[in-house]
């Protein structure tokens, strides 16, 4: 059973992050950062309450900082989360969610 799912937008975010990271710091750093994000998704799925509630943005959403990014997610069931977006911390979240 999957513990987390990525929205279409989150998948696009992840591809953009991977492309930027590789072009700036190389494949090894890209692989490391994507692995760290994947580990963060798993941690959030296992402990969905660890993120900061952000109902002021969207009802039921939580956010969790990871390095230069903020992971936005919500619980789907008692056993899974949906990663909604992975946005750079400098972005305007309201316009992206």
Outline where the language-model segments fall:
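Basic/aromatic recognition patch in beta-strand/loop cores that engages polyanionic ligands
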Residues: 49-78
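Enriched for short, Lys/Arg-rich terminal
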Residues: 74-97
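Conserved N-terminal glycine/acidic-rich loop preference
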Residues: 9-16, 49, 71, 93
